[in-house]
Amino acid sequence: MTEKPVPHPTEESLPYWEAASAGKLRLQRCASCHAVRHYPQPVCPKCYSIEVEWIDASGRGAVHSWTVAHHAFHPAFKADLPYTLVIVDLEEGPRAMGRLDPAAAPRIGLPVRLSFGADRLPIFTPAE
């Protein structure tokens, strides 16, 4: 059996992955214009500032879009098929992507809450 690939944090993403290991969501916020962003990056896409701070996020949001994966893009994920991927509008503003709890029925606007699996990858569950 092939092991699932794990994230390899960069300098910019390390605080995100450390929080994920603890089951928490942390997002970058520009210290100049206060725009919240995800995924972590070294420069604010709004004002181009390099000043960044990290905030604890609620992990709550609503499904913006979804799709069902029927093809594994890595052999280690083949046993997981099919699975639902969602793009979520987070309460703090940015969008995040992850899997939807397999027991949940996907729909646009579904209120969800984020958790992290043992592999530190995001899993959204209905918050209704």
PLM regions: where:
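Well-ordered alpha/beta subsegment
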Residues: 93-128
